[in-house]
């Protein structure tokens, strides 16, 4: 009975969950991400990527739809000339390419500056470890 139950648990493990790495072979450019607390429609994630001393640092909840997921947020902006505060929509698209390969892209141009330092990026192929 225990063997059957443990096999059942293994089959229900979400395909998104795990530890992922961007360019694992390079210490100047790379990244690490953990995806956890997954259910059928969402997962939590923490991500850090870097290029030299510039970093991207993002954490939140992705919404899953088949082999794609999105993280959506808002970037605070302040216009000094008009003394106006406002928010710009930003986000990241996660696309599962295989069981061990995920492609990340910014949803729009404003997303880069919301999450990353001058030369860092989180875009690219992430490999499950």
Residue ranges and their predicted role:
Residues 1-12:
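Bacterial Sec-dependent N-terminal signal peptides
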Residues 12-30, 71-73, 122-129:
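Tryptophan-anchored aromatic micro-motifs
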Residues 13-21, 39-46, 64-81:
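Short, hydrophobic/aromatic-rich segments at coil-to-beta transitions
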Residues 18, 33-34, 60, 92, ...:
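Residue-level detector of beta-strand structural context in well-folded domains
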Residues 26-66, 103-120:
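N-terminal glycine/threonine-rich, aromatic-flanked beta-hairpin/loop signature
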Residues 68, 96-103, 124-129:
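A short, hydrophobic secondary-structure junction motif
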Residues 71-91, 112-114:
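An anionic, turn-rich surface loop/hairpin at beta-sheet edges
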Residues 87-107:
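Short cationic/low-complexity microdomains
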């Amino acid at each position: 009975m225990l063997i059957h139950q443990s096999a059942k648990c293994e089959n229900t493990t979400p395909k998104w969950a795990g530890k992922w790495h961007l360019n694992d072979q390079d210490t100047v450019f790379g990244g690490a991400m953990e995806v956890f607390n997954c259910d059928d429609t969402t997962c939590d994630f923490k991500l850090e990527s870097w290029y030299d001393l510039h970093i991207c640092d993002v954490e939140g909840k992705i919404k899953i739809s088949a082999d794609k997921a999105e993280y959506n947020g808002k970037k605070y902006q302040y216009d000094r000339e008009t003394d106006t505060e406002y928010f710009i929509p930003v986000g990241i698209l996660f696309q599962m390419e295989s069981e061990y390969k995920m492609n990340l892209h910014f949803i729009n141009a404003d997303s880069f500056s919301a999450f990353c330092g001058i030369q860092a990026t989180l875009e690219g192929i992430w490999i499950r470890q």
